[in-house]
Amino acid sequence: VLSIIVPTLNAEKSLPGTLAALAEAARMALAHEIIVSDGGSRDRTCDIARRSGARVVVGKPGRGIQLAAGAAAARHA
């Protein structure tokens, strides 16, 4: 399984395009999951991610922390 982890913080404007591009690229993999690891956004980032079919993990901000949380949430971590 290919797990794609996207760390975010208040990314409602850029996230739809990012998720659409990742979903298109992930279609080439046999199995995939997209995980949005959010650092406490105050906008609609998490709602947008969920509506696109991504799994959402919310935790502390910080790219490394968010990547680790996303990796821990991956189905085959």
Question: Where in this protein do the model-derived segments appear?
Answer:
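Short, well-formed alpha-helical segments that are part of the catalytic scaffolds
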Residues: 11-26
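Short, acidic/glycine-rich phosphate-metal binding loop used to engage nucleotide
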Residues: 56-65
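A conserved acidic beta->alpha catalytic loop
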Residues: 38-46
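Donor nucleotide-sugar binding loop of glycosyltransferases
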Residues: 11-14, 41, 63
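A generic structural motif
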Residues: 27-32
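Short, conserved SAM-binding/catalytic segment
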Residues: 25, 50-54
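Cell-envelope/extracellular polymer assembly enzymes that use nucleotide-activated donors
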Residues: 1-3, 33
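Active-site nucleotide-sugar/metal-binding loop of Leloir-type enzymes
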Residues: 51-52, 65-77
